[in-house]
Amino acid sequence: MESPRLIWIPTGVASSNLRYLAGHETAHQWFYGLVGDDQATEPFTDEAVADFVARNVLGLKRASRCSTGRLDLSIYSYSATCYYEVIYIQGGNLLDTARQQMGSTAFWAALKGWADANRYRIATTKSLLDALDAATPIDLGKTLFAPRFPRLY
């Protein structure tokens, strides 16, 4: 669970998950603590980014166990079974696809620029996607984001 400057990991967590959980919750220090969002209506903005950063740093890859879903819905719109799979895993994988298509240098520069521009503010998913899209000549909005975020495109 994220909280500024503090990571909460409950007892009983499998030791094989500790590295990922510590990485994910540390990423929340930037993507929730530094750049806020509306976690209920736009969970992608911090959960998918935190998942992506943790998995990227640790070199972890994972496919989702749920069918491909929309990433622009509120937490209340997903089943309990697929919320984590869609928002965290599919969302993180979508960001990794954006990184691969843009190139790592452009991706990380865009993410840093977005974080700097939204420091201590409430950011939106659309502002994040727009920052990534603006950092590449590839039309990510049309080719990658629109199918998963129809409410925003």
Protein language model features and the residues they cover:
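Juxtacatalytic substrate-recognition/specificity segment
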Residues: 1-42, 60-62
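Post-HExxH zinc-binding segment in Zn-dependent metallohydrolases
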Residues: 4-7, 12, 41-74, 138-144
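Membrane-embedded glycan transfer/ligation machinery
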Residues: 20, 51, 96
